[in-house]
A protein has these predicted regions:
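Periplasmic solute-binding protein
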Residues: 1-33, 39, 57-84, 175-181, ...
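Conserved C-terminal helix/tail region of periplasmic/extracytoplasmic solute-binding proteins
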Residues: 25, 239-291
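Extracytoplasmic/periplasmic substrate-recognition and gating elements
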Residues: 26-27, 109-110, 148-212
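Short helix-initiation/N-cap motifs at beta->coil->alpha
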Residues: 33-40, 115-129
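Glycine-centered hinge/linker elements that transmit conformational signals in sensory
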Residues: 43-44, 86-117
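Alpha-to-beta junction loops
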Residues: 48-52, 130-138, 151-153
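Short, solvent-exposed loop/beta-turn-alpha elements that line the ligand-binding surface or hinge
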Residues: 57, 74-99, 148-150, 162-171, ...
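Beta->alpha turn/N-cap motifs
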Residues: 121, 138-143, 159-160, 176-178
Length: 291
């Protein structure tokens, strides 16, 4: 009803790519800002027998979450994407979406290192921190694990360059994460309010976001972390991501999602057009059911 009902503790970004600064410098590769530059970088690394990307493919979700930035680059207005899918002005098998699927196949099939499907999600940060892989697409929450695995490892974090146009690749996509709320009928209201007051003390909140790696939502806080320095230039372009808006229509099929993990070797699909038609058909089944 227009009132505050919880205190949000921070934001997370899931649309970026961690990159190994030393490998980029050694191979004289510029940090990519467009999709063609990303493709060229991966081809150069592979020619030098350096795996381009890694991710926790064994767990499934890190593969499609790793490509959320690609979806954002193609559809920067994520709320409009969801609205368009519901009203039919955007389809997962239209020309623009087919470009997205084609790029997703390149990402899953050609950019991911061989064997990524056997890497657990919690092992991927350590694999990247070992220095053996050039890039690691994933969320901002991985940064503390990377630093813990190898404190001296020199890495950076960039928006996923999924568009052919650099200006479209300057957004962060993510979500507002954990929050505290106080039940209206709690017998401990005074204690709960006092806890939130202490938690919101600038020094306490700063220590919290530094420790957990959240992007702060309290105006008093600063981006003190290593990843914060890379996030800051584009933080004004932070947008809530697709999956926070999306509510699938009841009756939609199991493939009604924009997931890169459908492609081999993580899934069974190997034709972008066939997959696009399948995804749209599964979505359409749900849309037709709720008309």
């Amino acid at each position: 009803n227009g009132k505050v009902y919880s205190i949000n503790l921070g934001r997370v970004i899931y649309s970026g790519i961690y990159y190994n600064k030393q490998l980029f410098e050694q191979n004289k590769i510029a940090v990519p800002t467009t999709w063609p530059e990303l493709v060229a970088a991966c081809e150069t690394f592979k020619a030098q027998n350096v795996p381009c990307m890694t991710a926790g493919g064994k767990d499934g979700w890190p593969i499609f979450v790793g490509a959320y930035g690609l979806i954002g680059a193609m559809y920067p207005d994520q709320a409009a994407l969801v609205e368009g899918l519901w009203n039919g002005t955007i389809k997962w098998n239209d020309e623009k979406s087919l470009e997205m699927w084609t790029k997703m196949q390149v990402y899953a099939r050609d950019m991911m290192e061989e064997g990524a499907s056997g890497i657990a999600g919690d092992a991927a940060p350590g694999r990247f921190a070992s220095g053996a892989v050039a890039m690691f697409p994933g969320g901002s929450w991985y940064a503390p694990a990377i630093e813990a695995a190898q404190p001296t490892f020199d890495w950076g974090y960039i928006p996923f360059p999924g568009s052919d146009t650099a200006a479209d690749n300057q957004y962060w996509f993510g979500k507002y994460d954990q929050g505290w709320a106080i039940a209206s009928n709690t017998p401990n209201k005074d204690a709960a309010v006092l806890y939130l007051k202490e938690f919101s003390d600038p020094a306490n909140y700063q220590a919290f976001v530094d420790a957990v790696g959240f992007i702060p939502t309290q105006p008093t806080a600063k981006l003190n972390t290593k990843i914060g320095a890379d996030i800051a230039p584009f933080l004004g372009n932070f947008r809530v991501g697709y999956e926070q808006y999306w509510i699938a229509p009841k009756g939609a099929g199991q493939f009604a999602n924009p997931w890169a993990s459908y492609f081999k070797p993580f899934g069974t699909d190997d034709d972008p057009k066939v997959l696009a038609d399948k995804v749209q058909a599964d979505l359409q089944a749900g849309l037709d059911a709720v008309k």
